[in-house]
Amino acid sequence: MTPRFDLIGMATTDMARTLDFYRRLGLDIPPGAESQPHVEVTLPGGIRLAWDDAEMVRSFDPDWTPPTGSPRHSLAFRCADPAEVDRWYAELTEAGYEGHLKPWDAFWGQRYAVLHDPDGNGVDLFAPLPEAD
């Protein structure tokens, strides 16, 4: 049997703020999860998304330190339409989360925006642009 992609794991230095960010994007994260050192949810399609707080990561990797610099990966959330990209970007930045690239019409045919979650991970918002007439 070949390995099957199953889980995206991320380390966080502020579980409560991180889970609030992803709840705002519609992920079904159980109430009270912010007090746990490990949280995971199953996304539509079966892939799991998990977060470990810094202490949990150091329990099996004592030399771990949070990365610095630009994000090493991004999670991309598809929005219903271009206006939703703008709305979600505004809602999240107004809630105090870091906007990185304001919404723009990308040359590849999508309305696109980039934020950073509380740990600096890239989070993209996108929607197909209407076809030009």
For every predicted segment, state its role.
Residues M1-D6, A11-A33, L43-E98, H116-D133:
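Glyoxalase I/VOC metalloenzyme domain signal
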Residues L101-W104:
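Active-site/ligand-binding-proximal alpha/beta "capping" segment
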Residues F107-Q110:
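Short, small/polar residue-rich loop motifs at catalytic or cofactor-binding pockets
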